[in-house]
């Protein structure tokens, strides 16, 4: 323990942690000193608070890692990497799950017929096997959203003016949802986050006869890690609808010309086609644009290439929407806001790796309802929260 760091009661520690997760260290210590009527030599110092929070966060991160490695070891999974390979003692229901019910051909055709009423040819749904393979929403599905969020890295001993091209610390946040319950994991480094995820799914038996559905913004590193850690069994990746729509609009804003209404019409028509999941129809639509509508043909080609690259992870968003199934990774984006962005991405802020990671894991632990157990018993339950 560093000089001036005092032993703290459980309630004092919890109050301190909740304050620093919402406020700057300066504001948090100011509130504490006002509440506790501490002044001058007896006051809580900002630097002392920051050092203690980083130390607490490091201990908490080690607690999550130790719990994960204990779980992995019990399944004979290599605990340093978390990658499931030959020799792992997983139940057959995890290795070769009996997947829950899908909507099937009859329901799919009925939904498509109803959806197509009054729509033009390009935006109509067309039945295929993929449509009938959508989960019906009543079976055992585990929805996993993965995202990275970068905060500015504070270099030690900065001199002179800040250089261009700042470095960033990447916090990986993973949100897990199943049967009305949820849990949030975070780590600096995607490999570390996925190791925690594998252990969490094993501990909660969420790989045993569960359909795994991943949502992401389409980043290659996320897709590659999903295959790296879950390639031994079934899984589905769905490209987040809001990200897809935003990305297409960005390309179109640079690639088309005309009146505001005309450009908006083109964006809306392309979105309507992609809503059905028919990526080739979307490419055909872009090919049909007149030269008078195109400002930058290179951007239109880049958009077509983007749609082709992401086509394996496009789904029939329209049918999923009709079935009240998820089409977006907005839950992990909300988790990102709570765990990282709300506290760490204000203008002018920069962070050390330990400082950023500490605040992120502390906030995630609060969201999961695990903070009291760690403060009082040094225990992580690793169980889903309602």
PLM segments and residue spans:
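Catalytic center-proximal scaffold of phosphoryl-transfer enzymes
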Residues: 1-386
């Amino acid at each position: 323990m560093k000089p001036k760091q005092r032993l703290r009661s459980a309630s004092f520690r919890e109050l301190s942690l909740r304050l620093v997760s919402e406020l700057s260290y300066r504001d948090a210590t100011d509130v504490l000193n006002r509440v506790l009527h501490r002044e001058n030599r007896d006051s809580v110092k900002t630097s002392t608070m920051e050092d203690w929070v980083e130390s607490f966060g490091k201990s908490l991160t080690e607690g999550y890692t130790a719990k994960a490695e204990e779980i992995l070891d019990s399944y004979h999974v290599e605990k340093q990497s978390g990658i499931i390979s030959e020799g792992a003692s997983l139940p057959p229901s995890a290795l070769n799950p009996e997947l829950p019910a899908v909507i099937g051909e009859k329901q799919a055709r009925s939904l498509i017929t109803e959806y197509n009423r009054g729509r033009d040819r390009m935006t109509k749904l067309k039945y295929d096997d993929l449509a009938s393979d959508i989960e019906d929403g009543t079976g055992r599905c585990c929805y996993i959203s993965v995202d990275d969020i970068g905060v500015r890295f504070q270099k030690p001993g900065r001199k002179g003016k800040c250089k261009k091209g700042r470095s960033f610390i990447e916090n990986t946040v993973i949100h897990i949802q199943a049967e009305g319950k949820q849990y949030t994991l975070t780590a600096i480094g995607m490999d570390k986050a996925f190791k925690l995820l594998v252990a969490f799914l094993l501990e909660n038996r969420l790989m045993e006869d569960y359909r795994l559905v991943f949502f992401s913004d389409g980043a290659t590193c996320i897709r590659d890690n999903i295959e790296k850690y879950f390639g031994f069994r079934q899984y589905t990746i769905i490209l987040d609808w809001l990200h897809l729509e935003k990305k297409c609009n960005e390309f179109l804003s640079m690639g088309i010309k005309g009146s505001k209404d005309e450009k908006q019409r083109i964006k809306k028509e392309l979105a309507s086609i992609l809503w059905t999941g028919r990526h080739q129809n979307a490419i055909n639509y872009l090919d049909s644009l007149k030269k008078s509508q195109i400002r930058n043909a290179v951007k239109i080609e880049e958009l077509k290439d983007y749609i082709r690259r992401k086509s394996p992870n496009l789904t029939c968003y329209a049918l999923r929407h009709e079935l009240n199934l998820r089409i977006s990774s907005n839950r992990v984006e909300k988790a990102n806001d709570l765990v990282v962005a709300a506290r760490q991405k204000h203008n002018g802020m920069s962070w050390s790796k330990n400082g950023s990671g500490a605040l992120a894991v502390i906030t995630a632990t609060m969201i999961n309802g695990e903070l009291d157990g760690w403060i009082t018993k040094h225990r992580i339950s690793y169980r889903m929260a309602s």
